[in-house]
């Protein structure tokens, strides 16, 4: 049974423990999930309120043309030049990943993915009958990519693609121009697909340039871009994403899956299209807030004895190393056995973002999607939890 092979979500699998803690009256600081708490653009919410239809019909399988045309102008601002026909609207970025895998890969084909990686990539590869081959990045090196030779060690006659997330979930790493050119050269040399998840492009904090896979010359037919409005506009619940590619054969294959699932969400597209008119100050305010939260979290983590976090360059996550024997045991313990003044923290055990056995055993992914006051308090609670945890691996309490 294929479902038995599907990995549990490291982000959501502890939800029953959290629910039980809340029943006991414990307040939980949710650092486990990338659900922004910042407001959805008013123009999107107003469009939702204005919906006045007598029938909520199917939308076109490719998505509304008006929305796709408007998206071309959005992408052009980032130097991504596409036409409306290059864009397929999906039910969230997750469906875009799944349809890309199902369209481009045969059972037994392999995808090279830097790890740690977003856990659902593994799940969708299993759904497609494909195999993830991971290439290790390390917290000590800030999760930068290894040299090209390490990639080539993994390439064989079943290798069909490389998958990246840029800026990265779960690490917050931003690929450099050198790294993107390295990936381009591999894609060109071995005629691979490049699946590029770029849903966090708005959130780059270092002044470094955003290098999209669509900027890479010579592999235009190999690139499949994955996008979503979920994190950009705090619209996770409307489930609107996009798959973008210049490759007509890939689009033709993807459309067969789109037609089989009938249509992307009608109401979600209305909200997402309207949200493209959000004023520039909306983006600035959201960006500035994440800059402050990032500093609050990373400074606070690195002040806790035994804890280390690199400085994430983008997105709104970090992977931190904790002085614990097993991060999943620690996260479970925080929810089931610990509280400090009636409060505790919920984090995502990082081992679930790796496929290499034993990797990430003492790491957690933390999302800085809470206001600074809550992040500051969550750091106090985390420090107290580490001081009390019986499986702590150092004596510096």
Map each language-model feature to its residues.
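PLP-dependent class I/II
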Residues: 4-8, 14, 21-27, 33-51, ...
């Amino acid at each position: 049974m294929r479902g038995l092979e599907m990995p549990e979500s490291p982000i959501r699998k502890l939800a029953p423990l959290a629910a039980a803690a809340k029943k006991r009256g414990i307040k939980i600081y949710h650092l486990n999930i990338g659900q922004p708490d910042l407001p959805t653009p008013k123009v999107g919410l107003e469009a939702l309120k204005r919906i006045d239809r007598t029938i909520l019909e199917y939308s076109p399988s490719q998505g509304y043309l008006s929305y796709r045309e408007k998206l071309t102008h959005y992408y052009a601002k980032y130097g991504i030049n596409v036409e409306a026909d290059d864009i397929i609207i999906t039910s969230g970025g997750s469906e875009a990943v799944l349809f890309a895998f199902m369209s481009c890969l045969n059972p037994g084909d392999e995808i090279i993915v830097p790890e740690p990686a977003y856990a659902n990539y593994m799940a969708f590869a299993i759904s497609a009958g494909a195999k993830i081959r991971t290439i290790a990045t390390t917290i000590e090196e800030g999760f930068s990519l290894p040299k090209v030779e390490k990639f080539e060690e993994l390439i064989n006659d079943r290798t069909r693609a490389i998958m990246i997330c840029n800026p990265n979930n779960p690490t917050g790493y931003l690929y450099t121009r050198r790294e993107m050119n390295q990936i381009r050269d591999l894609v060109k040399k071995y005629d691979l697909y490049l699946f590029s998840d770029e849903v966090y492009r708005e959130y780059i904090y270092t002044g470094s340039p955003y290098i999209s896979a669509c900027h890479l010359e010579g592999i235009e037919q190999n690139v499949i871009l994955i996008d979503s409005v979920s994190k950009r506009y705090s619209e996770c619940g409307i489930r609107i994403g996009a798959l973008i590619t210049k490759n007509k054969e890939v689009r033709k294959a993807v459309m067969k899956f789109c037609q089989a699932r009938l249509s992307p969400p009608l109401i979600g597209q209305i909200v997402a299209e309207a949200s493209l008119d959000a004023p520039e100050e909306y983006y600035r305010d959201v960006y500035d807030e994440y800059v402050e939260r990032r500093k609050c979290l990373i400074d606070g983590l690195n002040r806790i004895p035994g804890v280390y976090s690199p400085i994430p360059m983008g997105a709104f996550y970090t992977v931190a190393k904790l002085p614990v024997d097993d991060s999943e045991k620690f996260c479970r313990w925080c929810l089931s056995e610990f509280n400090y003044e009636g409060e505790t923290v919920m984090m995502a055990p990082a081992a679930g973002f790796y496929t290499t056995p034993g990797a990430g055993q003492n790491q957690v992914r933390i999302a800085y999607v809470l206001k600074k006051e809550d992040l500051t308090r969550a750091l106090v609670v985390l420090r107290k939890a580490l001081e009390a945890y019986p499986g702590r691996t150092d004596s510096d309490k």
